[in-house]
């Protein structure tokens, strides 16, 4: 089985590789640099989902893969949170028939100073968080979640949960009409 990932970010590519390998066995994963078609910092579930779907569709279109996978992180409004926003990773999986399945991982809140920079300066959360901890490559490694959870959960693992949730309908095709 061949799986194209609409990203070259190691935290995304390895997450896809590990989940697909665990479910399907022998898997070839091909990272493809694509344009998400949404702002670098998506805001709202609609924008975030659109980015994940765009990445998945472009990945499968540019290859002969069986599946295209897109992962997009974005902020969305949540009442009663400290900042008013939470971050979530959405995953889209597209097959050769054009069927899309979606999933997302756990949501979490960025520190208020990071959210303020996003909305006042237009800085992407990953960049703002990387600057906060003096690690410009943070989002390609343990991610903000790795820093915020003191290493208990890293970005790859967060992405793996989103990928697994997107595969739920494919693991149970008879219940989802696939």
Curated annotation (Swiss-Prot):
Gene3D superfamilies: 3.90.950.10
Primary enzyme class: hydrolase
Reactions the enzyme catalyzes: XTP + H2O = XDP + phosphate + H(+); ITP + H2O = IDP + phosphate + H(+)
EC number per UniProt: 3.6.1.73
Cofactor: record remark: Binds 1 divalent metal cation per subunit; can use either Mg(2+) or Mn(2+).
Stated role: Phosphatase that hydrolyzes non-canonical purine nucleotides such as XTP and ITP to their respective diphosphate derivatives. Probably excludes non-canonical purines from DNA/RNA precursor pool, thus preventing their incorporation into DNA/RNA and avoiding chromosomal lesions.
Name the record gives this protein: Probable inosine/xanthosine triphosphatase
Source organism of this protein record: Thermococcus kodakarensis (strain ATCC BAA-918 / JCM 12380 / KOD1) (Pyrococcus kodakaraensis (strain KOD1))
């Amino acid at each position: 089985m061949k799986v194209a990932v609409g990203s070259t970010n190691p935290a995304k590519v390895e997450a896809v590789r590990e989940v697909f390998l665990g479910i399907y066995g022998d898997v070839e994963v091909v990272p493809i640099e694509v344009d998400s078609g949404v702002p670098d910092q998506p805001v709202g579930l609609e924008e975030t989902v659109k980015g994940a779907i765009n990445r998945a569709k472009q990945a499968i279109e540019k290859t002969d893969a069986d599946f295209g996978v897109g992962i997009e992180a974005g902020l969305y409004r949540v009442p009663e949170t400290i900042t008013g926003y939470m971050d979530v990773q959405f995953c889209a999986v597209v097959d050769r028939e054009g069927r899309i399945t979606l999933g997302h991982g756990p949501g979490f809140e960025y520190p208020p100073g990071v959210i303020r920079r996003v909305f006042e300066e237009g800085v992407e959360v990953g960049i703002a968080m990387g600057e906060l901890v003096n690690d410009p490559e943070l989002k390609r490694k343990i991610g903000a979640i790795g820093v915020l959870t003191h290493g208990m959960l890293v970005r790859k693992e967060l992405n793996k949960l989103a990928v697994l949730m997107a595969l739920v309908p494919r693991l149970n095709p008879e219940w989802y009409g696939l």
